[in-house]
Amino acid sequence: MACLLETPIRMSVLSEVTASSRHYVDRLFDPDPQKVLQGVIDMKNAVIGNNKQKANLIVLGAVPRLLYLLQQETSSTELKTECAVVLGSLAMGTENNVKSLLDCHIIPALLQGLLSPDLKFIEACLRCPRTIFTSPVTPEELLYTDATVIPHLMALLSRSRYTQEYICQIFSHCCKGPDHQTILFNHGAVQNIAHLLTSLSYKVRMQALKCFSVLAFENPQVSMTLVNVLVDGELLPQIFVKMLQRDKPIEMQLTSAKCLTYMCRAGAIRTDDNCIVLKTLPCLVRMCSKERLLEERVEGAETLAYLIEPDVELQRIASITDHLIAMLADYFKYPSSVSAITDIKRLDHDLKHAHELRQAAFKLYASLGANDEDIRKKIIETENMMDRIVTGLSESSVKVRLAAVRCLHSLSRSVQQLRTSFQDHAVWKPLMKVLQNAPDEILVVASSMLCNLLLEFSPSKEPILESGAVELLCGLTQSENPALRVNGIWALMNTAFQAEQKIKADILRSLSTEQLFRLLSDSDLNVLMKTLGLLRNLLSTRPHIDKIMSTHGKQIMQAVTLILEGEHNIEVKEQTLCILANIADGTTAKDLIMTNDDILQKIKYYMGHSHVKLQLAAMFCISNLIWNEEEGSQERQDKLRDMGIVDILHKLSQSPDSNLCDKAKMALQQYLA
């Protein structure tokens, strides 16, 4: 059967491969070098703009032969150059073409060609990898495999405007992350590329600008250097500002704004600098206008969101610039009408990419509403905004869902909105759906937002708990992702705050004592702190304290002992002592402290600690244990006096810290009463 099946498959492939395509490849093997050269030139003309022909030639094995000719010392420079040109043309086809070229190890061969003294050949050898590296299927690491390549490319920057354009383009596509930035920076990228910003060639200026944007992104070292670079007597930020003026091409305005944004976010330019407030921010707002192309609006909104994200003043300025909040509402109505876009190709492109606009709008709304209550109110009052966000939570695109959750999370920081809009639109329902099955990046933001919805004043708290939130959150605490563990335990902490005994019992049952112990020994400090916060909230109000300690007392006391003995910071120890103070406030629970000499000695030790916070927390424990109005107080006071606690209280009553002094005096009063 296998033999019978093979024939039609081979026939279908071969039917695609025309006789003329075979003829082109056959000529590459001619013994006459002139005929080979002419064959390569004819092949070059045949493949221009013809993807089918490119695919045919690749299937017929043209690539290995072209690479062989390119690397042969006996080949003339003209032949080598033409081979590089054809390979560059083949790379401009489909992604499959690029994969085929990569499989033939084209990059090392072309980079080797850069050692030639011939400029035309060098340019052809650069043009092809420039095309290959711009493809998403090409691993950037191929540029960094040989350590001699980057310094050689830096040296070639001075050869011609084409070497400048292609090399900058290669750098901007292959600079992904801090390791690549460091390599390029250490090989003099800033000094070698800076002067290209004043090149007569627009393409060179543009590629140099793109280089600086990827070099500066989240990189303080590069950004701090860029601020002080002079080009023809002008500082780089001044050059970038000139490049984002309205009379410059949009691509240049946008990329300059990105450079200044990244330098600002990296701490090299102040957020209140005029070049940010009066130039960069207004330029990015302009890019959000509906007159701009879809990709310009997307890039403008996303860059602006990144610029203003940490700074409340920039958020306020942006929110009142050119009616930005209303302008972003248009991102959800795009394209508004078929007649508005006469170019059918453009319409088709925009319909396929309209989700990117929604994603960008959500991102910018999230940044705008991060801090200011009035801005959040304006966003929510924008037409159908809550409905749009809720719809965004169930979009097929993961990126849109993530941006919608982030936007909702930003708005959920408002007490007012949690009580009104979030309740009116039952936001918790789609959010719980998102939490059932989503990638980690969405889960982190969605669970963080759930923490806000579970705050005690939120009307959504009750229905969320009724829909099985406790179990879901306990599941998150077992995640390998520390951010999810933190959010799971944080949300449980909020749930336990002033909760009924039944909810607290549900939490302890679903979480299990074993998991609680695991969380208390978690290597992530945030997880530990939130777990202590949860315990503190569980152990509040006397009946609850006594009930929980009657069933889990032994394990909780064990955990407290371990933490107080461990190498933990002041905040962790303070929280732990506060838990002890809560236990000491129980009616029967306090016996677990009084019968544990080890714990009593630890409380005594922390009363004499050098840190006031720990002394105060230990004082709360003592005050709760000796309070006069409670049964058995006399025996407890006597035992603590025998331990030397009263002497310590006398010392603390002389403390320069007024709070500590008052608490000590109040405790001593209990002995005198």
UniProtKB/Swiss-Prot annotation:
Gene3D superfamilies: Leucine-rich Repeat Variant
Swiss-Prot/TrEMBL ARM repeat ranges: 51-92, 95-134, 138-176, 178-217, 224-265, 269-309, 313-352, 374-413, 416-455, 458-497, 501-540, 543-585, 588-627, 634-673
Subcellular localization, as worded in the UniProt entry: Nucleus; Cytoplasm
InterPro entries linked to this entry: ARM-like, ARM-type_fold, Armadillo, ARMC8/Vid28
Any Gene Ontology biological process: proteasome-mediated ubiquitin-dependent protein catabolic process
GO CC, alphabetical: cytoplasm; GID complex; nucleus; ubiquitin ligase complex
Keyword Zinc assigned: no
Entry annotated with the keyword Cytoplasm: yes
Keywords assigned: Acetylation, Cytoplasm, Nucleus, Phosphoprotein, Repeat
Disulfide bonds: none
Chief place of localization: nucleus
Location of N-acetylalanine modifications: A2
Modified residues (Phosphoserine): S337, S512
PANTHER family: ARMADILLO REPEAT-CONTAINING PROTEIN 8
Function, in words: Component of the CTLH E3 ubiquitin-protein ligase complex that selectively accepts ubiquitin from UBE2H and mediates ubiquitination and subsequent proteasomal degradation of the transcription factor HBP1.
Subunit structure: Identified in the CTLH complex that contains GID4, RANBP9 and/or RANBP10, MKLN1, MAEA, RMND5A (or alternatively its paralog RMND5B), GID8, ARMC8, WDR26 and YPEL5. Within this complex, MAEA, RMND5A (or alternatively its paralog RMND5B), GID8, WDR26, and RANBP9 and/or RANBP10 form the catalytic core, while GID4, MKLN1, ARMC8 and YPEL5 have ancillary roles.
Protein name per its UniProtKB record: Armadillo repeat-containing protein 8
Species of origin: Pongo abelii
